[in-house]
From Swiss-Prot:
Ca(2+) 1 binds at residues 51, 53, 55, 57, 59, 62. One of its GO terms (cellular component) is cytoplasm. Disulfide bonds join 11-33. This is Parvalbumin beta. In muscle, parvalbumin is thought to be involved in relaxation after contraction. It binds two calcium ions.
Length: 108
């Protein structure tokens, strides 16, 4: 997963920890999968995997399917989880998370 940035086992454990609807916490998830401890460069590399349409931004529909990027077959985030995740990361209020906003969110 993630081109060697994160261990598959760590990603699977992070996804498993938020299997229940409305149990997703981005801070807990980033810590459990190991992303929050990575360098800004590695965090930017992870951004590319999540930005599925390659727009340079992570939009709401990409956040909804966020867990599936870490582990195939994972659940979609609920609308409430997705909106809270977007609100936490979208510091300039443009409705999407840019790469610098992403680094700040992961390191928060």
């Amino acid at each position: 997963a993630f081109a060697g940035i994160l261990a598959d086992a760590d990603c699977a454990a992070a996804v498993k920890a938020c299997e229940a609807a409305d149990s997703f916490s981005y801070k807990a998830f980033f810590a459990k999968c190991g992303l929050s401890g990575k360098s800004a460069d590695d965090i930017k590399k992870a951004f590319v995997f999540i930005d599925q349409d390659k727009s340079g931004f992570i939009e709401e529909d990409e956040l909804k399917l966020f867990l599936q990027v870490f582990k195939a077959g994972a659940r979609a985030l609920t609308d409430a989880e997705t909106k809270a995740f977007l609100k936490a990361g979208d510091s300039d209020g443009d409705g999407a998370i840019g790469v610098e906003e992403w680094v700040a969110l992961v390191k928060a």
